[in-house]
Amino acid sequence: EVTQTTTVAALGKWNAALDVSGLKDGTITVTVNGTNDLGAPAEEAGTTFTLTQTKPTVDDSQTSINPTYAVAGAEVKVTATFDKDVTTPTGSTLGTAAINWTAHSDTRTEWVGMVNVEPVADSVKSLTLTLKGFQDAAGNTGVEYRLDNALAITPTLTLEKIGDVNEAGAASVAVNGNSTRFETSDELTIKAVDTDNKEVTQTTTVAALGKWNAALDVSGLKDGTITVTVNGTNDLGAP
């Protein structure tokens, strides 16, 4: 409980300010007591009100972006979940792009919106999700939420042209290329397939500046057109 004293003013009126910030949310019972100068106690008067001061927060476990990785310009879906009913999370962003929420006139625990992925430099691997601008029904402004690496930007791979190969060079065909948004520890898989769908594979890791290279042994493949591909998933799980 909290208590406060005051004195009676002219015409029997009185007033006071109570600090209830340390009390629990819910029903608050307020009473007033006093004894006059003749020692006679007044009958206690009382009332109640509802206290709601806990700020709404984002439920991290139920907040998501779909898909979890995308290229610049793609549209992704943001589902934001809160621990209580809130107003529209106005001003929320993915990176610097504003999220367009589905309009509702009421407060709710879940808000769904769409946003277009902004263009970013090749060195940028992910975007941050920021949720803010929401209030509960009592007018308490929510705690701003920030999630780094919320959306992975799709990495890229290139493969340099490979010249024709004869029997002498088939055991070690050099393949190389470039990449963006991979770490030097990330693994790539290179595959060579002949016209009979027989294949050979080789793994390598990305080197400095996104470059990569490997040597393929295609001596066991059939003469003719050989199709070579490279694939990989970066440390954020984006292929």
What name fits each language-model region?
Residues 10-17, 106-116, 208-215:
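Aromatic sugar-binding surface patches on proteins
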Residues 1-2, 76-103, 132, 184-195:
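Short, surface-exposed alpha-helix to beta-strand junction/turn motifs within ectodomains of secreted
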Residues 19, 45-59, 136, 145-160, ...:
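Flexible, low-complexity linkers/stalks enriched in Thr/Pro that connect modular domains
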Residues 65-74, 163-171:
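Short, solvent-exposed loop/linker segments at the N-terminal edge
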Residues 2-12, 96-106, 198-210:
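Solvent-exposed serine/threonine-rich low-complexity stretches and specific carbohydrate-binding patches
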Residues 35-40, 134-141, 233-238:
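Short, solvent-exposed loop/turn segments at the edges of extracellular beta-sandwich modules
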Residues 19-27, 117-126, 217-225:
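Surface-exposed, short loops/turns at beta-strand junctions within beta-sandwich domains
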